[in-house]
Amino acid sequence: QGQVVDLSDWYTTMKDNDDFMNYPGRRSIIEAQADLVQAYWESNLDSYDRQRMASERPNFRCSVSLPEYFYIPLDLYYDFGGKLGKQIHSKGKMEALNEALYKLPTAEQIYSPEKYFSEEPYIYVDIETLELENFTVIDEGKIDSLDLVYLLQTKIGKNEAVNAAIGLGGGSWVDYINDSNDLFMTVKILGDDVNELNEISDAFQNWAD
């Protein structure tokens, strides 16, 4: 992967720019490609090496119960990302996966691979900064489908949250704070179409109930 794309400072660049929109795409494709390479390598082992590898593989067990939201990005990178990676590989082999390291699928395209192959774009949404008495702006940014799942899943469930996130066209947010450290957020979201926007709205209504 490092021979295809310069990975030496990709995370540092995102951190310096405070823009992690490309992280889900790169992480998912990197992990999917690594899994495929490992599977190919293991498929060429003889029976002796297979048995030896199985006997030397540690049996890790985690006795710690983590909050549900901890697993949300891992589901995207390893589960949904793995499925997208396999579909890309089946259509264009490793060359197509290498190309995906440049194209970098959006979080929505990872959740819904057909949107990757149709090259459905993420739409940048302008949001107005409000003049709020006693409040000042502290941060702003863009919303992707992973953000929606983060917000919604623990309340309304994985399937409904992901279905809503698949319909996201784009979005932006602005955070405000006052002297009492009260936070206020404004969000502007665009759906892929009216029906998708209504589905996102319904998901937020269920989340708020």
Predicted feature residues:
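Hydrophobic residues within well-ordered, non-membrane alpha-helices that form the packing/core
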Residues: 38-42, 89, 208
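Post-HExxH zinc-binding segment in Zn-dependent metallohydrolases
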Residues: 2-54
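Extracytoplasmic/secreted envelope proteins and their assembly/folding machinery
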Residues: 31-38, 82, 86, 94, ...
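Soluble non-cytosolic domains of exported or imported proteins
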Residues: 21-32, 72-79, 91, 194-198
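Substrate-binding/catalytic groove segments of enzymes
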Residues: 44-50, 95, 195-197, 208
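Pan-zinc metallopeptidase signature
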Residues: 59-181, 185-188
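C-terminal soluble interaction/assembly domains
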Residues: 180-209
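Generic structural signal of hydrophobic/aromatic residues within well-ordered alpha-helices
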Residues: 7-14, 49, 53-56, 97-100, ...
